[in-house]
């Protein structure tokens, strides 16, 4: 039997990889072999960073809460401990949003935390 080189199937497969590599610099968006390696590495970065995003947002929320808490003369850790003692179940995402958009509500929560800490 004669050898079959792949023809349209190979071309389609390579075109797909080159299309995924659009926007890459240098040979990485032109040459199939290099483009394939870079696309695979890009998938690895994407997989890793989808998980990293969660911790990055948590760090951002904590930084925002801490900044707003210190304006109200309390540290982040004491605020969180006070809220726990006061049985206030507000997550960090909501606290950070309150700290930015509704300072009065955030101050009320800080006062609750301070009362709970004083009663301890």
Curated annotation (Swiss-Prot):
Superkingdom: Bacteria
Biological processes per GO annotation: ribosomal large subunit assembly; translation
Gene Ontology cellular component terms for the protein in this record: ribonucleoprotein complex; ribosome
UniProt cross-references to Pfam families, sorted A to Z: Ribosomal_L20
Coiled coil feature spans: none
Stored NCBIfam families: rplT_bact (TIGR01032)
Functional summary from the UniProt entry: Binds directly to 23S ribosomal RNA and is necessary for the in vitro assembly process of the 50S ribosomal subunit. It is not involved in the protein synthesizing functions of that subunit.
Protein name per its UniProtKB record: Large ribosomal subunit protein bL20
Species name: Ligilactobacillus salivarius (strain UCC118)
Higher taxonomy: Bacteria, Bacillati, Bacillota, Bacilli, Lactobacillales
Gene: rplT
């Amino acid at each position: 039997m004669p050898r079959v080189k792949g023809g349209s199937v190979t071309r389609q497969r390579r075109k797909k990889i080159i299309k995924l590599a659009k926007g890459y610099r240098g040979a990485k968006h032109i040459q199939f072999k290099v483009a394939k390696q870079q696309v695979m590495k890009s998938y690895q970065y994407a997989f890793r960073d989808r998980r990293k995003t969660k911790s990055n947002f948590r760090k951002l929320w904590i930084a925002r809460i801490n900044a707003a808490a210190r304006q109200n003369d309390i540290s982040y850790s004491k605020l969180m401990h006070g809220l726990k003692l006061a049985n206030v179940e507000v997550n960090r995402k909501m606290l950070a949003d309150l700290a930015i958009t509704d300072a009065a509500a955030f101050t009320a929560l800080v006062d609750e935390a301070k009362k709970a800490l004083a009663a301890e």
